[in-house]
Design a protein with these regions (language model features):
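Non-heme di-metal
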Residues: 1-197
């Protein structure tokens, strides 16, 4: 699904900057829960989607609580962080017209979860101690969330006779560009640091 691996320069920055990594990861879990709730409101007539998103929102908030617990254990002071460009960069490609919009939102969700999963796989063995252990523990859930979003996307595509494979390929190209282009700020889904370019 993903066209490119996480750049080595990003992994090096993540290992050296676990404070920002954890704070932003907590933000990502909150955003994931918020997105699930927003989809429930946007497609209120779809009870199948509502069931999936309700469960997802609860699980993402439990993950948020796990991250915050570790933040407290490590005596990290929380701070407000500006959002990275990754999710917004993907969502700019989302259609405004239904039912294409719903398909795009599901595909977008799948790519975010897929990249999270890939980064957990890279970070878990690279960061010793409780941070790496947490990422290893969360990895299976991210893979499950990716599959759920893909299944929902296929369901929308079949119901509305939309092109699934082509649209996934278009988002894959955008996603690859977002994670390989240098970034001025370090975030969980950012590209490699601009200073490393």
């Amino acid at each position: 699904m993903l066209l490119v691996p996480t750049p080595v320069a990003w992994v090096e920055e993540a290992c050296a900057n676990t404070r920002i990594l954890l704070i932003d990861h907590a933000n990502c879990e909150k955003k994931a829960a918020s997105t699930a709730l927003a989809l429930m409101f946007a497609y209120a007539e779809d009870l199948h989607l509502a069931d999936k998103m309700s469960r997802l929102a609860r699980e993402e908030l439990r993950h948020y609580e796990q991250v915050v617990k570790l933040v407290r254990t490590l005596n990290i002071t929380p701070q407000r962080l500006s959002p990275g460009r990754y999710a917004d960069g993907l969502r700019r490609a989302v259609s405004r017209a239904e039912p294409q919009r719903e398909l795009d939102l599901m595909i977008c969700g799948a790519f975010i979860e897929a990249r999270s999963c890939e980064r957990f796989e890279v970070l878990a063995p690279a960061i010793a101690g409780p941070v790496g252990a947490l990422f290893a523990a969360l990895n299976a859930a991210e893979a499950r969330h990716k599959k759920m979003y893909l299944d929902l996307a296929r369901r929308v595509a079949m119901r509305a006779d939309l092109e699934f494979t082509r649209r996934c390929a278009e988002f894959a190209a955008i996603e690859a560009q977002l994670v390989t282009e240098p970034d001025e700020i370090f975030r969980f889904h950012s590209g490699p640091p601009a200073s490393a370019a």
